[in-house]
Amino acid sequence: MTAVAVVGSQWGDEGKGKITDFLSKDAAMAVRSNGGNNAGHTIDIDGKTFKMRLIPSGIFAAKDNTVIGNGVVINPEVMFSELENLEKNGIDTSGLRISNRAHIIMPYDIKQDEYQEEAKGKNKIGTTKNGIGPTYMDKASRIGIRVCDLLEKDTFEEKLRTNLEIKNELFTKVYGKPALKFEDIFDKYYEYGQRMKKYVTDTSVLVNDALDQNKKVLFEGAQGIMLDIDEGTYPFVTSSNTISGGIASGIGIGANRLDTVIGVCKAYTTRVGAGPFPTELLDETGDRIREIAHEYGTVTGRPRRVGWFDSVALRHSKRVAGINGLSLNLLDVFSGFDKIKICTAYELDGEKIDYYPASLKELYRCKPVYEELPAWEEDITQVKTWDELPENAKKFLNRISELVGVPLVTVSVGPDREQTIVLKNPWEM
């Protein structure tokens, strides 16, 4: 297979960075298709930890190019900060390519995000306030500024002046906030465009050419399927399509070009921000998992909400994203536990259901139906093969695979690349 997609199958933070780094060592190209610097990913390599929000994880290993596609929204300041940190640590970034059709997060988008969230009061979504949503709003409203616009001084000036009129009207008259000044933005962002120029190309052509040549291309999804703008827990979702279908439009490839879709999940479930979470643990067990696994947001630093593994949510993700392989992370967290629970269904108003409701009110009334399994005492962080795993760990993994209806391809027992048990090679599925 030459096209493998990696998507988060929960609410993000599943550890996609690790599996994409692991797979990218065999890839000619690693491609990101959606989101922006609201999507944190952590990579541990040779004792060094890299926390990134925008540059694709494949930057560490992909042989030819690392690509930021047209579906990504780019904060230039964040991007150049990450590039500088990578280069300072000896990582070659010369293969980075940026779509000329990608949209730019402008200062007014960040302000709008902040003001909108503030105005919602108790109904706030829990946005990272990085301007992601407003940038996608600009895109849908056809007033967005794209990378290609940033490279053309006259075009950029015209669009910026027009947009500032629109945004300042909103800021001053609706939110009662000060107007932004053209001169505080124009020179700085035009300079970003000039610095960006060497990376910019038509990435749709680049990626399709690689696929036509049967090169291995790894597609990195951001966030998680349960945050998808259409299929997630709306309105507590992100602003882009995080399912595998969003990869095609976010890169500019045909939907039939993906060979394999790997869904990444944790051995439990986490969520950041507001929204329904049927298996959430608000007790000592939840606190224990959070501290063992250091469940704090890469972007925000906020403590993540923690719950038991939810197979109902995973089956939903499998269906809407066409997942045909599971990559499970953080199995080692349960070493030393007595029992582990898996949610097998929900109870809604006294009725047992096995699907994920669209209605928020229904979701908030759902109670998880649990199956309890024994855990294990052994430290598994040095385990290299399936046969070395404790029997109870194998039973837990097999039950997850059975409930979701998807085979496991990798199991992670620690943060490093080497702490990965490979059951099936995604490149050969």
From Swiss-Prot:
- What is its pathway? Purine metabolism; AMP biosynthesis via de novo pathway; AMP from IMP: step 1/2
**Cofactor detail note:** Binds 1 Mg(2+) ion per subunit.
Q: Which GO terms describe its molecular function?
A: adenylosuccinate synthase activity; GTP binding; magnesium ion binding
Key words, A-Z:
Cytoplasm, GTP-binding, Ligase, Magnesium, Metal-binding, Nucleotide-binding, Purine biosynthesis
Question: In which compartments does the protein localize?
Answer: Cytoplasm
Short name of any one Pfam family annotated for the protein: Adenylsucc_synt
**Which leading EC class covers this enzyme?**
ligase
Which of this chain's residues are annotated to bind IMP?
Answer: 13-16, 38-41, 128, 142, 223, 238, 302
According to the UniProt entry, the coiled-coil residues are none
Locate the residues binding GTP. Answer: 12-18, 40-42, 304, 330-332, 412-414
Q: What is its EC number?
A: 6.3.4.4
Name the CDD domains for this protein: AdSS
Q: Name one GO biological process term.
A: 'de novo' AMP biosynthetic process
Q: Which residues bind substrate?
A: 298-304
Please indicate if the UniProt record lists Ligase as a keyword.
Answer: yes
| Residues at the active site | 13 (proton acceptor), 41 (proton donor)
Q: Is the keyword Membrane in the record? A: no
Q: Which GO terms describe its cellular component?
A: cytoplasm
Catalysed reactions listed for this entry: IMP + L-aspartate + GTP = N(6)-(1,2-dicarboxyethyl)-AMP + GDP + phosphate + 2 H(+)
The UniProt entry, under HAMAP family, shows: Adenylosucc_synth
State the function annotated in the UniProt record.
Plays an important role in the de novo pathway of purine nucleotide biosynthesis. Catalyzes the first committed step in the biosynthesis of AMP from IMP.
**Subunit structure comment from the entry:** Homodimer.
Q: Which NCBIfam families match?
A: PRK01117.1, purA
Protein name, entry field: Adenylosuccinate synthetase
Q: Which organism is it from?
A: Lactobacillus acidophilus (strain ATCC 700396 / NCK56 / N2 / NCFM)
Q: Which gene encodes it?
A: purA
